[in-house]
Amino acid sequence: MARRFRGESNHKVDSKGRVSIPASFRRVLEAGDPNWQSGGNPELVIVYGDHRRKFLECYTMEAIDEVDAKIDALPRGSMERKMLQRMFHGQSFPTSVDETGRLVLPAKLRTKIALEDEAFFIAAGDTFQIWNPATYDQEELAAAEEWLDELPEDFDPMQYLDGAGGS
């Protein structure tokens, strides 16, 4: 199994859209790029297509290859395949980490998520997300708190994993 992204952090965004990626995230990007060599710059794909999402979803090369294989398995001509190709192929931005561990986010991507001078990075297993910190606080933290408030005080999150399969 591939390494997973873990953790969260805030990073400054400069006027050119450059933002440092958490060091632990860079290690996962390196491990998930079959063409990466020591001293090189790992590649990744940023998907921004779903207009309802207020974040950028960042995939390692291995993770996006898995998505591509699933899309390729859909029937040719199906609406699902067409829309997923548009979202994951057309509305995505292939890029690489620069020599100093930064991403350069184009204005189009920054505008989509209303990103200005600070970015919030949060791990999502085989991907990571980039958010405007205020948007994340308003939407995701509120949803998590609401969900937890509906559960009993002695709730154990591991109970959801019992019988989930895997190894």
Swiss-Prot record:
<keyword id="KW-0677">Repeat</keyword>
<keyword id="KW-0804">Transcription</keyword>
<dbReference type="InterPro" id="IPR020603">
    <property type="entry name" value="MraZ_dom"/>
</dbReference>
<dbReference type="GO" id="GO:0003700">
    <property type="term" value="F:DNA-binding transcription factor activity"/>
</dbReference>
<keyword id="KW-0805">Transcription regulation</keyword>
<keyword id="KW-0238">DNA-binding</keyword>
<dbReference type="InterPro" id="IPR003444">
    <property type="entry name" value="MraZ"/>
</dbReference>
<dbReference type="Pfam" id="PF02381">
    <property type="entry name" value="MraZ"/>
</dbReference>
<dbReference type="GO" id="GO:0005737">
    <property type="term" value="C:cytoplasm"/>
</dbReference>
<comment type="similarity">
    <text>Belongs to the MraZ family.</text>
</comment>
<keyword id="KW-0963">Cytoplasm</keyword>
<dbReference type="GO" id="GO:0000976">
    <property type="term" value="F:transcription cis-regulatory region binding"/>
</dbReference>
<feature type="domain" description="SpoVT-AbrB 1">
    <location>
        <begin position="8"/>
        <end position="51"/>
    </location>
</feature>
<dbReference type="GO" id="GO:2000143">
    <property type="term" value="P:negative regulation of DNA-templated transcription initiation"/>
</dbReference>
<dbReference type="InterPro" id="IPR035644">
    <property type="entry name" value="MraZ_C"/>
</dbReference>
<dbReference type="GO" id="GO:0009295">
    <property type="term" value="C:nucleoid"/>
</dbReference>
<protein>
    <recommendedName>
        <fullName>Transcriptional regulator MraZ</fullName>
    </recommendedName>
</protein>
<dbReference type="InterPro" id="IPR037914">
    <property type="entry name" value="SpoVT-AbrB_sf"/>
</dbReference>
<dbReference type="InterPro" id="IPR035642">
    <property type="entry name" value="MraZ_N"/>
</dbReference>
<comment type="subunit">
    <text>Forms oligomers.</text>
</comment>
<feature type="domain" description="SpoVT-AbrB 2">
    <location>
        <begin position="92"/>
        <end position="135"/>
    </location>
</feature>
<dbReference type="InterPro" id="IPR038619">
    <property type="entry name" value="MraZ_sf"/>
</dbReference>
<dbReference type="InterPro" id="IPR007159">
    <property type="entry name" value="SpoVT-AbrB_dom"/>
</dbReference>
